[in-house]
Structure formats: structure tokens, C-alpha cells
């Protein structure tokens, strides 16, 4: 039985075909990249459409994955899978240590500085070489209408309260 859409988390995206035997090229959002291959049953989602897929095999190929899906044996048919997000139920994600969070848990949190000013909400995160970066967008009640990029580091992030939907940060509002 398919998992409800609000209980799914995106772990990758099919970006193109790979080879001539119906394999697809996948950009993985997992760390390490090939952890995505641990999940055999995928819910694929694109433009409001969902479909189920089963991973037969896959391998790391540079910074992407090459994946073979059950029943997908033709390059042209594989091309129709381009653009699908790869989702799994949240319940299948491994448990994290205290103080560790999945990105999806941080998205939507209100970001509040030390002075109690609402800077905005976390729209999404970016992976950079040095550290992850939170993209904080303005929202109702925020200090101004500026988008901010804040490092996801122990120096910047003071506390996270998922139940309250808040993150406290040490960040100058003028930045």
C-alpha cells in the first residue's frame, strides 16, 4: 500500500538516462551518496503524479548513481522517468543521535536571532564544501523581506526546538 504523500521524504532525483539498457542516472541527496541504494522500494513523484518503483541494482558512478529499476529495460522508456523525485517513507530513515537532524526536519522552522527577532523560515538547505547552508526566506512577521544564507554550524545555531518549530541563532540581522 503506498505511503501518504505527507509521510514521504525525498532522497534523490532521476536526472537522465544512463546507457542503452534502461538504466537511469540518479542524483542522490543521501550521505554518503550510495546510501540511496539501500532502499529498494521507491515512490517516484513528479508534478503531482506518483508511481511505485523497485530498485534491482545500482552503483556509484562519479558524483551520481546508475540505477536499474524492475521492468525498465529500454532507454526511451527510461527517459520518461527523468525528473521524478525519489521518495521513501520517513519511517525507513535510520534513527539519529541526540542533536542530529535530517534536513526535512529543519525546513519550515522559524529562525530567531539572539535579540528575539524573527529572521524568517528555513526554506531549504544547500551542501557546500565547508558546511551546509540554510536558506532563510522572509515570512509573515519577519524582521524584513530579505533572504539570508546562514551556515549550519555549532557557532551559528544555538538551539533547535522541533516541537516549537524554532531555531535560535547567533546571527547579525544586518548580514
Swiss-Prot record:
One of its GO terms (cellular component) is ribosome. One of its GO terms (biological process) is rRNA processing. Coiled coil: none annotated. InterPro entries: PRC_barrel-like_sf, PRC_RimM, RimM, RimM_N, RimM_N_sf, Transl_B-barrel_sf. It comes from the Bacteria. One of its GO terms (molecular function) is ribosome binding. Binds ribosomal protein uS19. An accessory protein needed during the final step in the assembly of 30S ribosomal subunit, possibly for assembly of the head region. Essential for efficient processing of 16S rRNA. May be needed both before and after RbfA during the maturation of 16S rRNA. It has affinity for free ribosomal 30S subunits but not for 70S ribosomes. PANTHER family: RIBOSOME MATURATION FACTOR RIMM. Belongs to the RimM family. This is Ribosome maturation factor RimM. It comes from Pseudomonas paraeruginosa (strain DSM 24068 / PA7) (Pseudomonas aeruginosa (strain PA7)). The gene is rimM.
Amino acid at each position: 500500500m503506498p505511503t501518504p504523500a505527507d509521510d514521504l521524504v525525498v532522497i534523490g532525483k532521476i536526472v537522465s538516462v544512463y546507457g542503452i539498457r534502461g538504466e537511469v542516472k540518479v542524483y542522490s541527496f543521501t550521505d554518503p551518496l550510495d546510501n540511496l541504494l539501500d532502499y529498494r522500494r521507491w515512490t517516484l513523484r513528479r508534478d503531482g503524479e506518483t508511481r511505485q518503483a523497485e530498485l534491482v541494482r545500482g552503483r556509484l558512478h562519479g558524483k551520481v548513481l546508475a540505477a536499474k529499476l524492475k521492468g525498465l529495460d529500454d532507454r526511451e522508456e527510461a527517459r520518461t522517468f527523468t525528473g521524478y523525485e525519489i521518495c521513501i517513507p520517513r519511517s525507513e530513515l535510520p534513527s539519529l543521535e541526540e542533536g542530529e537532524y535530517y534536513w526535512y526536519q529543519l525546513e519550515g522552522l522559524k529562525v530567531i536571532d539572539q535579540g528575539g527577532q524573527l529572521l524568517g523560515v528555513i526554506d531549504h538547505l544547500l551542501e557546500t564544501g565547508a558546511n551546509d547552508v540554510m536558506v532563510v526566506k522572509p515570512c509573515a512577521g519577519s524582521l524584513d523581506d530579505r533572504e539570508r544564507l546562514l551556515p549550519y554550524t555549532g557557532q551559528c545555531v544555538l538551539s533547535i526546538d522541533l516541537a516549537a518549530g524554532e531555531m535560535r541563532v547567533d546571527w547579525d540581522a544586518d548580514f
